[in-house]
Amino acid sequence: MNKGLKIGLIAGGSVMVLGAAALFVWMKFGKTDAHLRLIPKEATTVAVINVRNLFTKADPKKLMLLPVFQKAAGNGNMSPELKKLMDDPTDLGADITQNIAGFVNQQDGISTSGLVFKINDGTRFASAISKIGGYTRPNKVDGLWYIAIEQYVGLCWNDEAGVLFVGNPLIDESNQKQAERLLRQPQEYSILDNPNYKAFAAQDFDIGLMVDNNVVQRTAGSNDWMDIYNMFGSPTGWSDVLVNFEDETVDIRSTVHKANGAESVLRTSGPDASHLDALADKNPIGFISLALDLKALLAQLRADANMKRNLEEVEDAMGMPMEDMLRSFNGDVSLALSDYRNIVDEDPVLKEKMEAMRKMYLQFNSRFDGFESDEYNYPAEIEVPVFVLNVGINDTVFPGKMLREKIRMQRVEYGLYSASSGFGANVYVAMKGKHMIVTNSYGAASELIRTGRLQGKPAADVNTKGPLAGRFELMPEKMPATFTDMLKKEMGNRDYMNMVRFGKPLQYVSISGEGNTNLLQVHLAPAADGSNSLYRLLAHTAEVMNTF
């Protein structure tokens, strides 16, 4: 095993021992979030780690029975101070079972950030940090301790809470003073007095992220990114992302809590029953589908001044109002990746272009004997990921006008248009029935024109009746051989096999959503012993690392 992996295992083993010993601390001290009053009330972003949940699900006592952790913890490379700390975590002076929270705060465009944790005994924490970190033991001044780590990074604490604070050189105040002010701020100026945070913290999660949209809007100003964010996040209200390690899945749930009852841009039900008939030319490696409420989407776009101006520019360019443009579309959209292959043989248009380039190359060489130019050395094959973007349409009135008059794509046949992508392959747009597909596969485009549908279907266990659905395969055996061969070629066989070994417990990713809530789930193979997904991921990773 190389040195880096050994260090990683020692650190991992140390964390597991601390986790096991922390169960004792858990019994000794009650749960509290009082230390989080250090976070400013109008922090832009707050991330909370529920340490107790993670310790319970990781099952550190069980992990420590694994040979890899027993070997790492008992190899004798541990300092006396760290060993003492692992034997008795309370010696640190900090309560490692309480929630840890990070925050980003913005005022007048200037950002500061910090990591907040619970302190039980400031004096013992000062002693432990000075021994473990090699710092000069700080003196207590006005009830506070401070250690400067870098010019704008410092560790500040009292007998109740601590913060690893990252200041900003644009603030005309020392880093220490900025950190000390957080420790002295009363609760009414802290995140604990923020009603949005209270609603966020009341939820059950292992790791949670909260974004206050009101503060983001006020501090970030107006730009293109904010326009897009506001379309889905709303300039008022707040958003959160909650991560939970369940038994057979890792759940990542995001919700936009919009103020004033703002509508979702998703419909209440899934796409038209026929929409997924043109999902992909083969069963997809991954896909995502959306059923959009175009009226709600347009209303939210027009609610933002900058986006409204952009829409007006589009209306002027197209010579018609947005309502007339959108009348041609039904709001159903899907994007699928189906393969990685050479697309030249299936594409007569591309084949003709490549043959012309080949002749030009030969003529060039015949004039300059022995001279070769990459400019004219057109490849014999073009291997690309094959994608299909399917947009549901009610008619071809506006789409046809846009393709012919504005984008000026070349018409190949009725309903089929092409354009060069600039990357060798062509891009095709085909319209038939309720489908308008955009793809780099001539075969897929021509199949839609001939039959009105494509062969690829979503996996049987995917619920496509909701307004948001998706699935992405993670198991190599479920992927086309051409795709895995490409990964081996790009990564190298050794790195590819290591990736497969590390990812062995993972099966696929599913996506679903309704209203203002979306759910991404990473699915693991079922466990015979019923253990939690976090334990299994940690145990598997440790065992694989031990084989290097």
Task: Show the residue positions of the predicted features.
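Short, Lys/Arg-rich N-terminal segment immediately upstream of the first membrane anchor
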Residues: 1-5
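Long compositionally biased, domain-poor regions of proteins
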Residues: 324, 329-433, 439-440, 445-446
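Structural boundary/hinge residues at secondary-structure and domain interfaces
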Residues: 6-7, 11, 18-149, 187-234, ...
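Short loop/beta submotifs within extracellular cysteine-rich repeat domains
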Residues: 55, 122-126, 172-174, 396-398, ...
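Short, structured motif recognition centered on aromatic/hydrophobic residues
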Residues: 46-47, 112-117, 162-165, 384-391, ...
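Solvent-exposed coil/turn segments that connect beta secondary-structure elements
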Residues: 52, 119-122, 160, 169-170, ...
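C-terminal regions of mature proteins
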Residues: 505-539, 543-547
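An internal, short helix-loop-strand segment that often contains or flanks glycine-aspartate motifs
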Residues: 65, 69-99, 132-247, 274, ...
